[in-house]
Amino acid sequence: DPDVRKRLMPELFHCDMDEFYETCEIFADSEELNSVLVVSDETESYNLFHFLLTEAKATLQNDLYLIKEDPSFHTFYNFIKGGDYLNSSWTQQLHQTKRLHIIYLAVHPRMQHHGMAAMLMDEAIRYAQEHGMMISLETHNEKNLEFYKKFQFKEYGILKKNFNLKQYCLIREYQ
């Protein structure tokens, strides 16, 4: 339901961002840019207990938002069903520890097509190159594929399971 999605997105995005503030090593966010880039440097060590606790808290908070919005559990059920598309577990197949994973790249709609996403992507690529890292990311929007291909990303695979949603898994090898 588009109306439910519109109401839930700010809540779920806020919850995700709270989790990322706690668990991500590199973070770019700016009201001036009206854009956000969240990445995870997979070479960095982390406190597993803190990571799992933060992730559990975020999952519980997301679930509560979904149930509050739709007490029938229909939205919650669909969210659970789509779980395969809402994570980066596919990256385990890469067997690559020197990797930067792009979790979020978003630009406010009124600032799109002004080069903000390209500027943030250039910065992520620069960091990865300096550290000899592969970059991985996923997108659910087929229209984004052309943008990523401009940065030498290649399609690693496509996840498609229970419904029409596809997850495009992309990598950029260290060059």
Where do the PLM segments sit?
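Conserved acyl-donor/pantetheine-binding loop and adjacent beta-alpha core of acyl/acetyltransferases
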Residues: 36-104
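Hydrophobic, well-ordered beta-alpha structural blocks that scaffold small-molecule cofactor pockets
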Residues: 83-90, 123, 127, 150
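Active-site rim helix/loop that mediates acceptor-substrate recognition in acyltransferases
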Residues: 2-25
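Conserved acetyl-CoA-binding loop-helix of GNAT-fold acetyltransferases
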Residues: 104-107, 113-126
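Conserved beta-strand-loop-alpha-helix junction that forms the acyl-donor binding cleft
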Residues: 103-112, 136-145, 162-165, 172-174
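Conserved GNAT acetyl-CoA-binding A-motif
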Residues: 99-100, 127-140
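Conserved beta-hairpin
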Residues: 22-40
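Conserved active-site alpha-helix within GNAT-family acetyltransferase domains
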Residues: 118, 130-132, 141-158, 162
